[in-house]
Amino acid sequence: MGEQQQQVERQPDLPPGFRFHPTDEEIITFYLAPKVVDSRGFCVAAIGEVDLNKCEPWDLPGKAKMNGEKEWYFYCQKDRKYPTGMRTNRATEAGYWKATGKDKEIFRNHHMLIGMKKTLVFYKGRAPKGDKTNWVMHEYRLADASPPPPPSSAEPPRQDDWAVCRIFHKSSGIKKPVPVAPHQVPAAANYQQQQQMAMASAGIIQVPMQMQMPSMSDQLQMLDDFSTTASLSLMAPPSYSTLPAGFPLQINSGAHPQQFVGNPSMYYHQQQQMDMAGGGFVVSEPSSLVVSPQDAADQNNNAADISSMACTMDAAIWKY
């Protein structure tokens, strides 16, 4: 019955939905400063007193006046490691509290310094080989800290001996990697890219191939290797001996193809020159000054036929 009554007295009478989440400035102004001025008379329903050197962090939620919260507030007095020193003893039976980072300054109205906030992390074991845990403490103290008094002094505790501590357990959630959509690459491009990456990893450098043209001396050497007869046969014009007499040359003119019938006498001189060249004789160029009467008549007739056809047809429709 007594424990149940004590539990009821510890719970503050707050309406449903209200939570105790003061700001840093509110903790210094409304909860720490009045406690320093009147440590015995000032009492807050949401903050209890505890000796942090005799309690492990996982036992503190059961000693808090506010249940069901994720952070717990306590008044505590600093335990000086040395009577004339400024260092605080922060060790417990299972481990110790270690300060981390730089103290944060707390201002009123953004210009008046009223307090400081220190962040500490709890380590299991003994320093300096303790195991870090997720228990974190924010220690609030007033900004005006005077030197500690002599041990023989009977003065009451100084204002920097009191502090408000906020304890909470930091969750260590593992962040899931964000899936990245694969980049769509064509098969041929992907294969070529993989080849380039494999060659680059193997230290192989790709150099573009350049075609080397033969020099002039090489070309002359190649010409010297051929005989006179072979060179003459290569330089001879194409043979028209396979063409029958009156071989028609067809000219496509849209939907009306026309045929041009050549005279076999036009190829007489060319055929004669090719036969002589094939026999190994050197043939001189035909003279343009001496023309037989029959050849002149044939050339005139062919020129007249061609000119008449060219006049009636568009040059853009000639196809070879």
UniProtKB/Swiss-Prot annotation:
Gene3D superfamilies: NAC domain. Expressed in developing seeds. GO terms for molecular function: DNA binding; protein homodimerization activity. InterPro entries: NAC-dom, NAC_dom_sf. One of its GO terms (biological process) is regulation of endosperm development. The keyword Nucleotide-binding does not apply. Residues 114-176 bind DNA. One of its GO terms (cellular component) is endoplasmic reticulum. Pfam families: NAM. Residues 14-170 form the NAC domain. Keywords: DNA-binding, Endoplasmic reticulum, Nucleus, Transcription, Transcription regulation. It is found in: Nucleus; Endoplasmic reticulum. Transcription factor that acts redundantly with NAC26 to regulate the expression of genes involved in the biosynthesis of starch and storage proteins in grain. Directly binds to the promoters of starch synthase 1 (SS1), pullulanase (PUL), glutelin A1 (GLUA1), glutelins B4 and B5 (GLUB4 and GLUB5), alpha-globulin and 16 kDa prolamin, and activates their expression. Possesses transactivation activity in yeast. Forms homodimers. Forms heterodimers with NAC26. The NAC domain includes a DNA binding domain and a dimerization domain. This is NAC domain-containing protein 20. It comes from Oryza sativa subsp. indica (Rice). The lineage of its organism: Eukaryota, Viridiplantae, Streptophyta, Embryophyta, Tracheophyta.
